[in-house]
């Protein structure tokens, strides 16, 4: 049965606090927070805009209490220091760190090209030259970070983003590894990452070299890019681990002989005999068409590293999160947010049309009222076996049954994009991606009386002006500029 965690949406809204933005938006320092881009048990990533200069960023919001509870202060300071010093063109940049009394905010580079994951499906493998280009950028970025003592430990296509020019950007470098510890033997001992991409020595949990484990994951990614499917796959976790331990996989016939040879040397189950990053970089297959990265020099300040745990109130990095409670209406998307979700202005849409992708989020538009949309979603999801929690115009749908990758969890939010038009964004926050799309298809079928257009229908209308959202964005820009 659907349950709600906050008062009814008819509750009168409070007056907007001084310094907060209108329409229920949250303001943190000089940044106005927008929609949620991704979330996990440890943090949420929000789209944000610098109100002083208009720059767009992504802000990772971490619960300070969890950091303190897990005695991770020294570790998080070390990770932040390293991340701020990393200035590689293929790694997401960290610009600054802020903190409130309850949260830590990482201000990160925002890229608009989508995930590399979105370019891959069972029928959408990349050509070898294109796969090699991304692999070269990946190896360069990971090797650079290793040279500065930072290991990823959860490399997978979902953590590899693309900028507007199609260049690779590795995300969550170092930060994804915060809960892990190095013991006295100098080896990592925490099993982490996505099982299909994890090295056998990590699964063994006997201690492992972070660089060798990351290289294994890079090898799996290369295989996926070229094959369109995973080298190690099994619905039974024990059977999957056995395949990984023995490196039981077969390269498809379209792999070149030199690519097969390199992948087999990377996916060596014995870390002692596995090829190294230095050897990969000197490999003839790898060097074909290689372009060295171009670095930018910039001054870096580490003053904010200690300041984020300074609660004296004297630190300039201590910010106050201001927001409006009890919204009467959904948040209204501004012009840039419309553009950033627009199919016509997002490079990822070009790949979607060609690849038949499996994405972790989707959306539809509706001309029904916001309250009716929320009520109908609650009514449609409950019979499908989902617990529904509603907080104003944000919803969390959690499956009662456990699927292939645990319980399916779907974060949903209703945005107003025009006086009588709303956009409903649904994002997988837990569970299996394919199960998410099956759920979404069944849900929207049950919502056909309120769904105006789905994302697929928008694409069918073409990318000129970005379809519904692109046209809406253009009209919004024109209105704001007058």
From Swiss-Prot:
EC number(s) per entry: 2.7.11.1
Region feature (Disordered): 1-29, 459-482
Record GO terms (molecular function): ATP binding; potassium channel activity; protein serine kinase activity; protein serine/threonine kinase activity
Catalysed transformations (reactions): L-seryl-[protein] + ATP = O-phospho-L-seryl-[protein] + ADP + H(+); L-threonyl-[protein] + ATP = O-phospho-L-threonyl-[protein] + ADP + H(+)
The organism's place on the tree of life at top rank: Eukaryota
GO cellular component: cytoplasm; cytosol; nucleus; plasma membrane; plastid
Every NAF domain range: 328-352
Listed name of the protein: CBL-interacting serine/threonine-protein kinase 23
Natural source organism: Arabidopsis thaliana (Mouse-ear cress)
Classification of source organism: Eukaryota, Viridiplantae, Streptophyta, Embryophyta, Tracheophyta
């Amino acid at each position: 049965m659907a349950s709600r965690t906050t008062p009814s949406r008819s509750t009168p809204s409070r007056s907007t606090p001084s310094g907060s933005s209108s329409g229920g938006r949250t303001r943190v320092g000089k940044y106005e927070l927008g929609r949620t881009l991704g979330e996990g048990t440890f943090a949420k990533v929000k789209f944000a805009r610098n109100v002083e200069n208009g720059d767009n960023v992504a802000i990772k919001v971490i619960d300070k209490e969890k950091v303190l509870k897990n005695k991770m202060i020294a570790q998080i300071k070390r990770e932040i220091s390293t991340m701020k010093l990393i200035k590689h063109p293929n790694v997401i940049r960290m610009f600054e760190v802020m903190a409130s009394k309850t949260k830590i905010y990482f201000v990160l580079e925002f890229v608009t090209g989508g995930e590399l994951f979105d370019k891959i499906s069972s029928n959408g493998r990349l050509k070898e030259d294109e796969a090699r280009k991304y692999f070269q950028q990946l190896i360069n970025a990971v090797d650079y970070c290793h040279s500065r003592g930072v290991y990823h430990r959860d490399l997978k296509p979902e953590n590899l983003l693309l900028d507007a020019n199609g260049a690779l950007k590795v995300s969550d470098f170092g930060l994804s590894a915060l809960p892990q510890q190095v013991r006295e033997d100098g080896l990592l001992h925490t099993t982490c990452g996505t099982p299909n991409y994890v090295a056998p020595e990590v699964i063994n949990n006997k201690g492992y070299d972070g660089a060798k484990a990351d290289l294994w994951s890079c090898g799996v990614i290369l295989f996926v890019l070229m094959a369109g499917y995973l080298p190690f796959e099994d619905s039974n976790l024990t059977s999957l681990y056995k395949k990984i331990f023995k490196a039981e996989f077969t390269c498809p016939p379209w792999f070149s002989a030199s690519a097969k040879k390199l992948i087999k040397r990377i996916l060596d189950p014995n870390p002692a005999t596995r090829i190294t990053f230095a050897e990969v970089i000197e490999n003839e297959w790898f060097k074909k068409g290689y372009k060295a990265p171009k670095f930018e020099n910039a001054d870096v300040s580490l003053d904010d590293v200690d300041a984020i745990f300074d609660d004296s109130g004297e630190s300039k990095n201590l910010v106050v999160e201001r927001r409006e409670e009890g919204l009467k209406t959904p948040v209204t998307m501004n012009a840039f947010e419309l553009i950033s979700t627009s199919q016509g202005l997002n490079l990822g849409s070009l790949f979607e049309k060609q690849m038949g992708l499996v994405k972790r989020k989707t959306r539809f538009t509706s001309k029904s009222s916001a309250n009716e949309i929320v009520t109908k979603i609650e009514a449609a999801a409950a019979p499908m076996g989902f617990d529904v929690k509603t907080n104003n115009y944000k919803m969390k749908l959690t499956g009662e049954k456990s699927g292939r990758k645990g319980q399916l969890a779907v974060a949903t939010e209703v945005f107003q994009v025009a006086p009588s038009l709303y956009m409903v964004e649904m994002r997988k926050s837990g569970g299996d991606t394919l199960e998410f799309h099956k759920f979404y298809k069944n849900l929207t079928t049950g919502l056909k009386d309120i769904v105006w257009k789905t994302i697929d229908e928008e694409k069918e209308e073409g990318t000129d002006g970005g379809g519904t959202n692109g046209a809406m964005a253009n009209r919004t820009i024109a209105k704001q500029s007058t």
